[in-house]
Amino acid sequence: MFLTLRRWNRVSKDVWCLLCISLSVMATPVSACSRVVYRGPDGAVVVGRTMDWEQSLEVNLWAFPAGLERDGNAGARSLKWKSKYGSVAATCYDKLVADGMNEKGLVVNVLYLSSSVYPQFDGTRPTLSIGAWAQYVLDTFATVDEAVTVLKDEPFQLGVLIMPGGHAGTVHLSLADATGDSAIFEYIDGKLVVHHGKQYSVMTNDPSYDQQLALNGYWQEVGGSIMLPGTERPADRFVRASYYLGEAPQTSDEREQIASVFSIIRNVSAPIGAVHAGQPNVAATLWRIVADQKRGVYYFELTDTPNIFWVDLSKLDLSVGQPVRMLPVEDAPVMAGEVSSRFEKQTDFQFMVGSDPGEEK
C-alpha cells in the first residue's frame, strides 16, 4: 500500500489534467460499444467487438457477392458504385451495416460517437448515407492503406440518419486488415480525423479518440495490475480492453486466439439491465462479433443465447453473379457451429436514408 500511495503522490500535473478529462466524460452521454485487434504469431489477426443499445437492432447477417450495383441513398447526388469484393455483414433493421468482413480479410466496425459533427452538404461531391459507410468500404477496398489513401481526401460527404426512437445515428468507423493494419475515422467539429497505424488496436466511444489515448496513457502509468477502472463508461472500457489485450497469450492455437478475443470483449460488455433513460447507447450488450482475418471466419454471439456460431467465408460463393443471401439471426432458432449453408437467397435491401447534416441543426 505504501508503494502504491507513493506512486499516486508522484502523479504530474499533466496526469491530473487527464483525470479532469475523465471526470468530464461522466457528464456526457455514454456510448457502449468496444473493439479490439489481436495480433498473434504466424500472421494471425483477430478483431472483436461488442454492440450495445437500449432496444433490439433486429440484427441479421447478409452475404453480398462482388458485382452489386449500389446506391448511397443520400439525396440527388447520392454515390453510386459497384462492389469489387464479396462480404459478410451484420445489419441493423436490414437498413444499415454495422459490421462486416470482406473476402480479402478487411474488417469494418461501426461504433457510436455522440460527439460526431459532420459537415453539411456543399453540393459539389457525391453523398453517402452513414448507414452505407461501412458497406462502401467492404465493397471497395482490400486493405486499410487503400482505404485511408482514398477516404482521407473525402471523395464523398456523409448523410446523417435518425435511428428508430428518434436518436441521431452519429458514429465513427474502425478498419483492420489481414496484415494487422488499423485505422480510425472520426468527424470532429465538422472535420475528418484519421488515426492510421497498428498501434490503434482498441476503440470504444466518447470522448474523441485522441482523448481516449491520453486517458489510457494515464492508466498505463498507474499499472493495470494495481488498479483498473471498472465502470461501463467508454474511457474505462478502453483502458480495460487495452490492458487485457496486452495480457493476451501469443499463441498459434486458433481456438485459443478466438477464445482470448472473446474473453476480452466479454470483459468490456455491459450487463443485461444496464439501461439509462434518454441514453440509448448506455445499455446492455446485444451481441458480440469476432473476425478471424487470416482464416476468413466470422464468429457471432448473441448475449441471450448459449452458443457461438460462425461463417466460413470460403464456403460462401461471393463471386460476381451470385445472389444476395441472408441469415436470420435474432428471431431464428438457436444456432451453433458453422452456418454458411443456412444462408438463403434474399432481395437486397435499401440503405436507410441519409440527409444533409445542415438540415439537422
Spans of features found by a protein language model:
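N-terminal secretory signal peptides that target proteins for export/translocation
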Residues: M1-V11
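Proteins synthesized as precursors that undergo proteolytic processing into mature forms
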Residues: T124-V160, E254-S263, I272
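Structural recognition of the beta-strand scaffold that forms the well-ordered cores
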Residues: V46-G48, V107-V110, S174-A176, I184, ...
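Bacterial N-terminal signal peptides
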Residues: V15-M26
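C-terminus-biased signal that marks the final domain/tail of proteins
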Residues: S31-V46, G159-M163, H167-G169, A178, ...
